[in-house]
């Protein structure tokens, strides 16, 4: 722009380039994601189940692998979202831990797009078994309900009975 202002050139050839690049994305090719094979998933879950250090993560890993839920969707699951009779999970919110209005805390957010709100099938009996067992254990261990923005009956909790953070899983 300085060269245009000083009459060295009549038109800035780079004007609007940044806007164009920004609208096209970062210009970097998208990372190729490679899904775990069934065998890799079995090995992963076997490792977790036998590990004294990681075995407490087995229920959340079974649900994540068996449903394809995002971590915030999984940690935000409530008993009302899970229908074990019809083997479905209703996805309509996420549990996040962020700084909002200057305060770091857990918050409920809704999916960014309409397609983010969905009902997914529970295709594997292991997922239903883990969810059923978790609900029973959480009810027994933590009879006091956590409530966040009207949502209650959270299935996944940390060892203290509070919300399970996605940061711990990631």
Language model segments and positions:
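Short, Lys/Arg-enriched alpha-helical recognition elements, typified by the DNA-recognition helix
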Residues: 1-4, 13, 153-155
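Basic, Lys/Arg- and aromatic-enriched nucleic-acid-binding interface segment
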Residues: 9, 15-71, 75-77, 85, ...
């Amino acid at each position: 722009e300085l060269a245009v202002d000083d009459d060295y050139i009549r038109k800035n050839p780079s004007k609007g380039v940044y806007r164009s690049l920004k609208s096209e994305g970062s210009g970097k090719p998208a990372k190729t994601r490679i899904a775990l094979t069934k065998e890799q998933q079995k090995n992963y879950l076997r490792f977790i189940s036998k590990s004294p250090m990681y075995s407490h993560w087995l229920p959340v890993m079974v649900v994540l692998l068996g449903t394809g839920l995002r971590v915030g969707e999984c940690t935000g699951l409530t008993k009302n979202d899970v229908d074990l009779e019809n083997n479905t999970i209703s996805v309509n919110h996420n549990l996040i831990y962020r700084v909002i209005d200057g305060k770091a805390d857990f918050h409920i957010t809704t999916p960014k797009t309409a397609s983010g709100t969905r009902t997914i099938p529970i295709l594997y009996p292991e997922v239903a078994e883990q969810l059923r067992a978790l609900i029973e254990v959480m009810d027994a261990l933590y009879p006091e309900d956590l409530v966040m923005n009207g949502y209650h009956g959270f299935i996944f909790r940390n060892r203290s009975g509070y919300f399970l953070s996605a940061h711990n899983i990631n």
